[in-house]
């Protein structure tokens, strides 16, 4: 019974995707036909897409921006998560609570403030401004990675420090390799979130 439910769920999820894919190969006047498989296969939509638009350039610009934002977020997230997990400093508790509280408010609430700041610096309609805005939203990822680092044995850190390693060396040579799976997940989350962002992108890139 469990497998039946799984297969039914898979079919329900994949059917719209299959419909869109098959519709893309239909002639221009047969998109809304009730049949799943078009009566006449055509690649005219793809021909029009690649020959009449700058689709590849648009895609490359989006991917490039997403890679840059994801890399910046990963660097900031990993450093912050290590600091909150392994170091004890003044304001640590309040910093963690602030990150948690920030998750309550949608990022759209800060758009007006961001725009005023970007406008004052004369960076409106620039990739630098968009990267600055999108790379900052990593509070959830910091909590996610901190929880993962908390589960790593502290004895490894202590053994390395006994041998003379600094905190940064412990972070780079021990924590990062052990946290590689979680780092990959965070990079993927950041990439997808940036690629899916429309409102902020449309505001800062006019």
Enumerate the language-model features and the residues they cover.
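A structural signal for multi-pass alpha-helical bundles of membrane permease subunits
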Residues: 2-206
């Amino acid at each position: 019974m469990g497998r039946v439910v799984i297969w039914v769920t898979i079919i329900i999820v994949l059917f719209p995707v299959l419909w869109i894919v098959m519709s893309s190969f239909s002639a221009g006047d047969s998109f809304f036909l009730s049949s799943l498989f078009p009566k006449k296969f055509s690649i005219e939509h793809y021909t029009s897409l690649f020959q009449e638009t700058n689709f590849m350039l648009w895609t490359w610009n989006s991917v490039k921006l997403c890679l840059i934002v994801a890399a910046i977020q990963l660097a900031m997230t990993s450093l912050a998560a290590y600091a909150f997990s392994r170091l004890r400093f003044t304001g640590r508790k309040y910093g963690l609570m602030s990150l948690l509280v920030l998750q309550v408010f949608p990022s759209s609430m800060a758009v007006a403030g961001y725009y005023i700041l970007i406008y004052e610096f004369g960076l409106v309609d620039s990739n630098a401004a968009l990267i600055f805005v999108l790379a900052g939203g990593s509070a959830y990822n910091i909590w996610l990675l901190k929880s993962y680092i908390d589960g790593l044995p502290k004895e490894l850190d202590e053994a390395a420090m006994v041998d003379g390693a600094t905190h940064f060396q412990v972070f780079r040579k021990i924590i990062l390799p052990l946290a590689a799976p979680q780092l990959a997940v965070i990079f993927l989350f950041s990439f997808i979130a940036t690629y899916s962002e429309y409102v902020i992108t449309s505001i800062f890139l006019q």
